[in-house]
Amino acid sequence: MLFKEKIPGLILCFIIAIPSWLLGLYLPLIGAPVFAILIGIIVGSFYQNRQLFNKGIAFTSKYILQTAVVLLGFGLNLMQVMKVGISSLPIIIMTISISLIIAYVLQKLFKLDKTIATLIGVGSSICGGSAIAATAPVINAKDDEVAQAISVIFLFNILAALIFPTLGNFIGLSDHGFALFAGTAVNDTSSVTATATAWDAINHSNTLGGATIVKLTRTLAIIPITIVLSIYHMKQTQKEQSVSVTKIFPKFVLYFILASLLTTIVASLGFSLRIFEPLKVLSKFFIVMAMGAIGINTNVSKLIKTGGKSILLGAACWLGIIIVSLTMQAILGTW
C-alpha cells in the first residue's frame, strides 16, 4: 500500500481532529476523543467516495492509534510512579481484578460480545480511552466496538467528576484518601484531574498531584494486560499453530516501555521532563485523530441496538471499582 493512497484519509481524520480538540479544551469533562467519535459518525454518514479515503482511515484507526500509545510512555517517570504510587498498588490490583472479573461474568450473563466486554472491563479498570486504545489492536476490535466502549467510559467519567467530591465529603475521606479514591476509581486521566480539582476547590486542599500519580501507576497495568490478552487472543485464533513470543508481544507495547524507560533515565539525570511535553500533546492529538477514524467506520444502528447492555456492564464495573477501592482503603487504614 503506497503512502500517497493513505493521504486523503489521513487529512480527513486530521480535519475532524481539529474542532474535536478545540471542543475538548472547552469542555474537558467530555473530552476531545468523544467529540471526535461524534463528528466522525456524522461525517461517515454523509461523505462520498469512500474508496478514496478508506486506506488512510484504516491506517489512522490502527497505526496512528498505536503510535499514540507509544508516545503516552513519554509521560511516565517510572521512578516517581514506584516511589509515590507503590502505596496504592494493593488497591489498584484489587480494583483492576474486580472490574475484569465483573466484565467476564456479565459478558456471559448478558450474552454480550466478548470484544466489547473486554474493552469496557479494561477501560474501566486501567485508564479509560488510553487502555482501550492499547487493547483494541491486540484483540482485533472493530471500530464500532471501540466507539461503544469509549462512549460507556465517557458516561461514567462524567458521573464520577460530578458525584465523587460530594461522596468523599459525605463518607469523611481525608485529602490523601480522596487522592487514592480518585486515582483508582476514575477511568480517564482528564476526568481524574477534573474530579481532584473539584475536591480541592471545595476543601481548599491539594490532592491533584497525588491522584495523578496513582492514576499513572494504574496506567502501567497496560503492559501486563495487553500481553496476557495478546496471548489469549492468539491461542484462540491460532489453535492449530504454535504461538511464539514474537507473535504475542505487541511491538507498540515494547516501544511504550522503552519510552517510559527513556523518560525515567532523563529524569534521573536531572533534566526537566518538560522536553517531553510536545510528545505527550501529540499522543493526545493522535488519539483524537484515531477516534475520528473510528467514528467514521462506526455502525450507528449496531451501537444503538447493543448499547443498553454495554451501559449496564460499564455501570457494574464502575460500582465494583468504587466499592473495592473504598473497602481496601478502610482495610489498609488510608481513609
From Swiss-Prot:
Keywords: Cell membrane, Membrane, Transmembrane, Transmembrane helix. The keyword Metal-binding does not apply. It comes from the Bacteria. Disulfide bonds: none annotated. It is found in: Cell membrane. The keyword Protease does not apply. InterPro entries: UPF0324_pro. PANTHER family: INNER MEMBRANE PROTEIN YEIH-RELATED, UPF0324 MEMBRANE PROTEIN FN0533. Belongs to the UPF0324 family. This is UPF0324 membrane protein SAG1125. It comes from Streptococcus agalactiae serotype V (strain ATCC BAA-611 / 2603 V/R).
